[in-house]
UniProtKB/Swiss-Prot annotation:
UniProt enzyme class: hydrolase
Entry-linked SUPFAM superfamilies: Homing endonucleases
Protein name: Probable intron-encoded DNA endonuclease 2
Similarity remark: Belongs to the LAGLIDADG endonuclease family.
MF terms in GO: endonuclease activity
Further comment found in the protein's record: Encoded within intron 2 (LRI2) of mitochondrial large subunit ribosomal RNA.
Superkingdom classification of source: Eukaryota
Function: Mitochondrial DNA endonuclease involved in intron homing.
Location of this chain's protein in the cell: Mitochondrion
Length: 43
């Protein structure tokens, strides 16, 4: 998933955290999903 700057302006860190937690939970690997998604965005 690629988000542009305008999307980020309208999303709070709490919302992003919820997305990461939900995605990681659905994948059955919470911590790995969270770390992977954050690392992808920060690259």
């Amino acid at each position: 998933m690629v988000l542009n700057d305008k999307v980020y302006e309208n999303i709070s860190p709490q919302t992003l955290a919820c997305w990461f937690m939900d995605d990681g939970g659905m994948n059955g690997s919470h911590s790995h999903g969270l770390q992977f998604r954050v690392s992808v965005i920060l690259k």
